[in-house]
Amino acid sequence: MIPVQVGKKIRYSYAKFPEILELPYLIEIQKKSYQWFLDEGLREVFREISPITDFTGNLSLEFLDYYLGKPKYSVEECKERDFTYSAPLRVKVRLLNKETGEIKEQEVFLGDFPLMTEKGTFIFNGAERVVISQMVRSPGVYFSEQVDPNGKKMYLATIIPNRGAWLEFETDVNDHIYVRIDRTRKLPVTVLLKALGYESKGRIAELFDHDDKIIATLERDNTDSREEALIEIYKKLRPGEPPTVESAKTLLDSMFFDPKRYDLGNVGRYKLFKKLNHGVLYRYLEEDGEKEYDKYLNDYVPVKREFIRELTNEDIIYTIRYLLGLMRGQGKVDDIDHLGNRRLRSVGELLQNQFRIGLARMERVVRERMTIQDADSLTPQVLINTRPIVAAIKEFFGSSQLSQFMDQTNPLAELTHKRRLSALGPGGLSRERAGFEVRDVHHSHYGRMCPIETPEGPNIGLIGNLTTYARVNEFGFIETPYRKVDKERGVVTNEIVYLTADEEEKYIIAQANVRLSPEGKFLDEMVNARHGSEILHVEPSKVDFVDVSPKQVFSVATSLIPFLEHDDANRALMGANMQRQAVPLIRTEAPVVGTGIEYKAAKDSGVVVLAKNPGVVERVTADEIVIRNDQGQIDRYKLIKFQRSNQGTCINQKPIVRKGERVEKDQIIADGPSTDHGELALGKNVLVAYMPWEGYNYEDAILISEKLVKEDVFTSIHIEEYECDARDTKLGPEEITRDIPNVGEDALKDLDERGIIRIGAEVRPGDILVGKVTPKGETELTAEERLLRAIFGEKAREVRDTSLRVPHGESGKVVDVKVFSRENGDELSPGVNMLVRVYIAQKRKISVGDKMAGRHGNKGVVARILPEEDMPFLPDGTPVEIVLNPLGVPSRMNIGQILECHLGWAAKALGINVATPIFNGATEEDIFEALRKAGLPEDGKIEVRDGRTGEPFDSRVTVGYVYMLKLAHLVDDKIHARSTGPYSLVTQQPLGGKAQFGGQRFGEMEVWALEAYGAAYTLQEILTIKSDDVVGRVKTYEAIVKGENIPEPGVPESFKVLIKELQSLGLDVKVLTDNDEEVEIKEIDDDIGEKAEEYGLAASIADRDEVKNEYYEEEVEADFEINDDFDGDLED
């Protein structure tokens, strides 16, 4: 064991191989990409669009330079006031009138542009959001093959641009080559070649070394000149329009050779260059300027150059040559799931595309205005309308599938969310269309995309995570680092080379755990290595590179699972996903058995406070740290106290430095949620015994000790936000007031003089948080009322109580109240005069029904809480804290939990924390050694006695310390009961789901169950008066209130609806008695309506906006597991 300094603590590491490379900054993918957008991306778009000329070519508008101003509000203010954290984008624009030669320059404001915060997130309308990276097929040329029923191979080549028309070349059974332009009907390929200017047949045959397949194709081609070829193409592309040579040429040029209409992007050009090997890459802007070395061309080329982003004739010719080569058996077809053919569009590029759409819309407006308005009075300011740009950006952040509400359950959830890769979204795949191949683990994922961490369910394999060391290159391909082998000396050097999936295919790469001498020479005769998709056993002399670290294959969440190497992949997947759902506990505790990456994960997640400069701490309080830096200046760090996260968990920072202490730059000076002295701390180390106990841990249930409840071991704070606004209505403004009709003084005791609850009040369901009255419609007044109105003035005006009350099943302490009003100059949405937000915090102790899990996918639900004295206890009298079922281990094959249990016990006994990095950690021998050192039994088992009787159990039991998490699926959020409540409009049945305060569905199968027992009356009652017999349920309620017998059920409303539906089909449906007399099914009686009002049941028909869905849909509730498959689109 090697002691490693982690922040202020020491961890003893079992690592066998040293870490060659530090972990990179984990949210670099977000920040670097956004920075690229600000520096380069915006400039690129302005360059593309500029200049905008009018239809006569007289006026032209150029975009020269741009800059972002200072943001108007800070991040905190934006969160508080529901604003977007953004800065004004100003652009220098020049308008040139070519007739008069007049030039007007102006600085124009192009709207507010959302800024990325320090943590790599955006604040949009007060909510913290993340833009995730999208995996899409890279532009370029792709070759594929199909085999027809006779066994003949047919080939297809497709040139896919970034935007523009597709060009496809295909062969048929007779080996003729055809071309399809933009998915239209096919033409012989020679027609396209003639149209491009290769007119003579001899010239075409020469281009392809007189290949017989081309000559055969020429025979199929009945055009004789360039003109005929152009017209033939035009007929295929625009059937029904009169073809002319001129329009045909223009069409073909604009389709493939016009940068405005066709764009391969830098990536597409690079991919064509790599695949076709034809040397077409750059356009040189100055042939004789200074030169520099270019790594792609391996040559010195002029510095002033740009990628050729449209198609060239060479591209088409070389593509056909490659196709001919494939038919001869040379070259190879592409695998579209290979990461060399899939690239990432990160924030910057996604924003750039959106901005481009906005600018293109604006360009149309500018052109129109140029034409309509008088040329002399025009200025850039008048021409430019910023609305389309602002709208495009708003649309992207507000409703794109890739802009997601940040998962903020805990720091790991935040970090992982920012590193997420999705194949879904605009221009990507759809869940229904994606087959198995796309979702599968591919050999090119190695070191780039984690094979473990992906959601279970419909998105499996479509949403992934970046691995720990991976980075994204300028073309959007994921690169992973390797150590270079110096072949001449046979030494593994510490030189790091980053390779993309394509480049890696050429090399033989050894694993990170090869045995090396101190000089870096291989110690083994043969080593394990990879080459492409194969695993080889090769002699060291053949190895080109060596992996940097075993961690490089896995994502951050996966790397946090100790002994991952002993867990089955399915369970590891659950473990990685469930760590993201752990709720932050009141008192955090770092794991005794960690993997050594906890510190880095917490530091980069953005929840802890880092010192900006080195210095000495001058003052520390709960909400602020003051440091005098080495320049003698004061740095103040405000800490976040009890703030609500997006998921309702609690964000709270606390200082971990003392007054007078010396701090260095980037040192962690304050802990955030779920961190302990700068280390990620998602759960607690608890003493666990693996044994059955009276059947209470059957089927993964968990038995816990009351100590965990009493000592607040698994207690978390949850904060809910309630909002109430006073609007202007047609009948007058709503008013927030303490004076509420028909409410006793008792209900108002915690409200202040404005009618808003005081901070610190304990509230229960139904309590008033904000008193509010709304004007009612004026009714005809009686003489007495008129008299009262005359005497008391306005006071007797009709108002109804629309106060904000605590919803069912919620309670807690009011921790914060925010009031915004128009009078105080706050910006509120139109029609709103006052807005009040109330925050209620709950302390939730662990309780029966809560979901808990370890880090190995071992999840379960708390089934019973036993008094401490009844728990099984160890020989020294220590009662265990949790009892897990041993049958949960063998079939699930997550043995890592047992090793963690043993090592945890030993480490706890020795009073140390250990790190066992994945695939590079403690071995069985190490664990035995640790147990021996701690004086514990070597097999990790010990005699345990029953707490109730003191008798020992039959066998010895595995006992040890395991890191357990409490997950966000808490029973308090799920439990729900209703007696009366809202009913659906059409069927008159209760709504479903907790969110609608609905009832429990008594479905088809449940009816069968009662039928099976012959419980006729129970069944009738459930299907009528407990559901949709409108008259019956009111009478029943009356009978219950008065203590009378329950009346006979009537006719269910849904039966009436059925009859009406049949009648609407034109069928004459009547209900008859035994004596063939027609039964009049009366509509709902008026007196019943009055009765209902009497019992306060009248308002129980659900309003349109209350009902999420008229008919009960499987749990309309909003508690689908956001974390399990969080992909931003909430179709689920």
Curated annotation (Swiss-Prot):
Q: Which Gene3D superfamilies match?
A: 2.40.50.100, 2.40.50.150, 3.90.1100.10, DNA-directed RNA polymerase, beta subunit, external 1 domain (2.30.150.10), DNA-directed RNA polymerase, subunit 2, domain 6 (2.40.270.10), RNA polymerase alpha subunit dimerisation domain (3.90.1800.10), RNA polymerase Rpb2, domain 2 (3.90.1110.10)
Matching PROSITE patterns: RNA_POL_BETA
Q: What class of enzyme is it?
A: transferase
- Which InterPro entries does this chain map to? DNA-dir_RNA_pol_bsu_ext_1_sf, DNA-dir_RNA_pol_bsu_external_1, DNA-dir_RNA_pol_su2, DNA-dir_RNAP_su2_dom, DNA-dir_RNAP_su2_hyb_sf, RNA_pol_bsu_bac, RNA_pol_bsu_CS, RNA_pol_bsu_protrusion
Swiss-Prot/TrEMBL catalytic activity: RNA(n) + a ribonucleoside 5'-triphosphate = RNA(n+1) + diphosphate
Q: What is its EC number?
A: 2.7.7.6
> Which keywords, in A-to-Z order, does the entry hold?
DNA-directed RNA polymerase, Nucleotidyltransferase, Transcription, Transferase
Q: Does the keyword Transferase apply?
A: yes
Q: Which domain of life is it from?
A: Bacteria
Q: Which GO biological process annotations does it have?
A: DNA-templated transcription
Cross-referenced Pfam families: RNA_pol_Rpb2_1, RNA_pol_Rpb2_2, RNA_pol_Rpb2_3, RNA_pol_Rpb2_45, RNA_pol_Rpb2_6, RNA_pol_Rpb2_7
Q: Name one GO molecular function term.
A: DNA binding
Question: Which family is this protein grouped under?
Answer: Belongs to the RNA polymerase beta chain family.
**Protein function:** DNA-dependent RNA polymerase catalyzes the transcription of DNA into RNA using the four ribonucleoside triphosphates as substrates.
Looking up PANTHER family in the UniProt record yields: DNA-DIRECTED RNA POLYMERASE I SUBUNIT 2
**Subunit organization:** The RNAP catalytic core consists of 2 alpha, 1 beta, 1 beta' and 1 omega subunit. When a sigma factor is associated with the core the holoenzyme is formed, which can initiate transcription.
Name this protein carries in UniProt:
DNA-directed RNA polymerase subunit beta
Q: Which gene encodes it?
A: rpoB
